[in-house]
Each structure stands twice: as structure tokens, then as C-alpha cells.
Amino acid sequence: MARRILVVEDEAPIREMVCFVLEQNGFQPVEAEDYDSAVNQLNEPWPDLILLDWMLPGGSGIQFIKHLKRESMTRDIPVVMLTARGEEEDRVRGLETGADDYITKPFSPKELVARIKAVMRRISPMAVEEVIEMQGLSLDPTSHRVMAGEEPLEMGPTEFKLLHFFMTHPERVYSREQLLNHVWGTNVYVEDRTVDVHIRRLRKALEPGGHDRMVQTVRGTGYRFSTRF
């Protein structure tokens, strides 16, 4: 499954060129021409990365990043700002607000792709790992594809990371706090019950192949991923 990239750019020629370059390099671009349409694209299947212009009809790129960071489902999506605002103070503001990289226009398409790949490697080091398989369930970190046999399964980026952690640490019980630290990281404040929400979503995503039974609740302790039902 190709990595989905949300391209938020109000200038049609630039947006179309960027989308063409992304498609040529194996990505799946999704377009948004203004602030509101970008917000409307924040749903499943979630974008793996967002290319974001600063100046947009209806709002700014900075406002959009703040919106992303407020929501638990989107705060981990990496953002690369692509803008004509090249002053040092603008770059600093963008990065401090939460952008993972900052590219000024005009830009080289090759550099754009290289920077996107660099951000994805930095944010998701699992992307260089091999396919993991357990009882007909397979997870490919490189393509972000999860399969139940030959059937593709759709899930959000947080559920994908949670499943990846479970499949690389099977048959062990983890508390909510441990899962938060391993999957969300220690520098992000998320309530313990957020784990329960994503566990439910992960189970729902695994239902078509019957693999939801592998995500097991251990009362009073936490969760375990097991092939023993």
C-alpha cells in the first residue's frame, strides 16, 4: 500500500506538480486546496505525511498544525511545510509549532522527495524492517500494508504502530502506561484511557480475518498480543 501524502496547497499548478512528482515516486497524493478541505481530509485512512503551505484560504498552515497537535489521532502525523516564506524567523516558527521539516519555494522535486523520505525514516524507523507474519496476519512496515491472508486491512497510523509493537512483542502483558511509552513516546501527554480507544479500533480493523482475538485484555493489568486463544 503506497504511503498517503496530503498535499495542502492553494496554487493549483504547484499542487498538481507536487502530486505528479509524488505519484512518480510511489506515493499516493491526496489534494486539499484550502484550510477547510484539508481539515476534512483528516480521516481514515489517515495520511502518512502532510505537505503544508503556510498561506491558505480560510486559515494558515500554522493554525492547521496546531489543530493537528490538539487531536490524539493526528498529533503524530509528520508535517513538512512547503512555502514561499523563507525568512529565518518563519522557519523557526514553523518548526517550533510542530513541523518536522521546512522547504522554501522554489524547490527541487528531487530534494522534496528526499526530504519526505528522510522525515519518514526519522519518524518511523520501523519502515526499514522486514514483513512480520503471525497466523495469517502480516504487517509490512515498508509499505504500511496489513493483510489478513490476501485481504488488505485498513487502519489508522496509531493502530498500525500499536499492531507493529504487539507483533514484535508477542505473548507479553503490557500495562496502559507501558504501551503509551512504547507506542506514543515519553514526551507526549496522552491519557491512559486513550489506549483503550485505540485497542478497540485495532480490534475492529482486525475483525475481517478473525485476528481481533489476538488482542487480549488481561484484567487488572493491561493487554497482550497472543496466538493462544
Swiss-Prot record:
Domain of life from the UniProt record: Bacteria
Which cell locations does it reside in?
A: Cytoplasm
DNA-binding interval(s): 129-227
* UniProt KW Phosphoprotein keyword: yes
Q: Which residues form the Response regulatory domain?
A: 4-120
Q: Which PROSITE patterns match?
A: OMPR_PHOB, RESPONSE_REGULATORY
GO MF terms held by the record? bacterial-type RNA polymerase holo enzyme binding; identical protein binding; phosphorelay response regulator activity; transcription cis-regulatory region binding
Any one Gene Ontology cellular component term annotated for this protein: cytosol
The family database entries (SMART domains) matched by this protein are listed as: REC, Trans_reg_C
Q: Which GO terms describe its biological process?
A: phosphate ion transport; regulation of DNA-templated transcription; regulation of DNA-templated transcription initiation
Q: What is its main location?
A: cytoplasm
**Swiss-Prot/TrEMBL keywords:** Activator, Cytoplasm, DNA-binding, Phosphate transport, Phosphoprotein, Transcription, Transcription regulation, Transport, Two-component regulatory system
InterPro entries, sorted: CheY-like_superfamily, OmpR/PhoB-type_DNA-bd, Sig_transdc_resp-reg_PhoB, Sig_transdc_resp-reg_receiver, WalR-like, WH-like_DNA-bd_sf
Signal peptide range: none
For the modification 4-aspartylphosphate, which residues carry it?
D53
Q: How is it modified after translation?
A: Phosphorylated by PhoR or CreC.
* UniProt keyword Cytoplasm, yes or no: yes
A Pfam family recorded for this sequence: Response_reg
Q: Which PANTHER family match?
A: PHOSPHATE REGULON TRANSCRIPTIONAL REGULATORY PROTEIN PHOB, REGULATOR OF RPOS
Q: What does this protein do?
A: This protein is a positive regulator for the phosphate regulon. Transcription of this operon is positively regulated by PhoB and PhoR when phosphate is limited.
What name appears for this protein in its UniProt entry? Phosphate regulon transcriptional regulatory protein PhoB
Native source species: Escherichia coli (strain K12)
Q: What is the lineage of its organism?
A: Bacteria, Pseudomonadati, Pseudomonadota, Gammaproteobacteria, Enterobacterales
Q: Which gene encodes it?
A: phoB
